[in-house]
């Protein structure tokens, strides 16, 4: 019996190998060459653009996209992709439109290992708008370009955006990291489902919104009107940030850290995660809520301070006297005597409350 099973398994293995071999021979014949089948090399397509335009619209499936400034005043689009991925480049109503069409056969999709790329050579440094709708691929926009508005949507891939944006900048990625560096005068909206957001050097008259489902957020050396960040899982860090009005941070799970920040009001709410604040000043109030997590102040202050935690200690130093009102069901309490005019209500179910006034 065992011998029969062994024979059957051997025959089955031989048939599988023969079937795979016949498939490859047939597919290669239909594809005309094995390099087209396995995607070992791409086909380069270069298209010159002679009409004037001030807006750019790109819709592609799978390609890394980058932009290069030309020195000769010419414009061209260079695509390197599978030969059955066709690119069209047109100018309509002042809009440079770049689109890809997928004409791959089914077996070419299985063995498609080509690393596709799309390079856009631009003669000018400033344009009215940049719009990109990409499925899979990395996107890079260098610093010597300037756009009035930018809107980037990406399913899978990283975005590195270093250009200046005059009005609004929106970057949304399902899976991938988003890095934004450079001056953005209007509003910045960055969003990822799975991935990190890094924002550095933004100078905004409008708001900064940085939202993630799973991922970390770092915002540094930036100014804006309001700053908002919502996320399920991940840490957030603000450093050297000036906000004219309100900072609002919500997290389900993750550490929150603020260093050298100023605002009118700071509001944060998290289920699980500690809060660390160093040299954070609010002209209005701190409103802090934690289910599980510690709160630490180092040389911070606000007119009014409200802290509520279920499990976690509240410790640190403030800059001015307050009307301290600490309450803890289980934990040590050590705060200065009530003084001044600003409120400082701190409530914990389980945790210590130890606050002092920092000597200046």
Give the positions of each predicted feature.
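Acidic (Asp/Glu) and glycine-rich low-complexity loops/linkers
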Residues: 2-60, 64-154, 160-173, 177-192, ...
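C-terminal amphipathic alpha-helical segment
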Residues: 260, 274-282, 294-299
